Amino acid sequence: MRIATWNLEGKWTPRHHWLIRSLRADLLLLTEVLDKVAIPGLNIHFTEGEMQPGRRWAAIATNAPLRPLPDPHGATALAEVEGFRVASSILPWRNSGGAPPWNGHDQGSRTAAAVTSIRTAGPLVWGGDWNHELTGRLYAGSTEGRESILGGLDHLGLSASTDASPHRLPGARSIDHVAIPAFWTVASVERVSAIVDSVELSDHDAYFVEVD
């Protein structure tokens, strides 16, 4: 099974569709998704809430049957896919502010609050734009936020296969992640550039995890 995540930055063109198809993913954990996005052959479920008109916080797309579930948090989509729960999330960035869907006085406390809600939903696969490096130096994330995410993963029995994946920026590590059960066997983890034909499709690259 191949699981991918990509922050679309609220854009959708034929090039975006091409890159999505090139990932050959069975399960897509998308963030900053226009609600007009449709991918032939894939079922898709969006968050109820919008970042701004026409742009949803997150979505889940899959070639398998999908049963939408209520959002456990305003910036997280949740669905049941082939009997297990899948979540796709945006977690707070440094200057996200405290307006809904965030709750807290800074990035760390807002992340902790979001993770608590997501953890309660019990996803078996969880990913998206977490705005935190999980290993190495913190450029985008916070210490408290990282600790909350890692604690949530441990509680759920998950491991972020992307924790050491490179960011597009030299020397930095990914803030986009895919977490799966710690006992699953990972065949490969790859970053896929979102710069196609010298055109930046998004300010985030895509990542996929291949599971045996």
What would you call each of these model-derived segments?
Residues 34-75:
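Ligand-binding grooves and catalytic loops that recognize ribose/phosphate and carbohydrate rings
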Residues 1-5, 9-17, 27, 58-212:
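Active-site regions of metal-assisted phosphoester/phosphodiester hydrolases
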Residues 1-42, 50-52:
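N-terminal, active-site-proximal structural segment of metallo-dependent hydrolase catalytic domains
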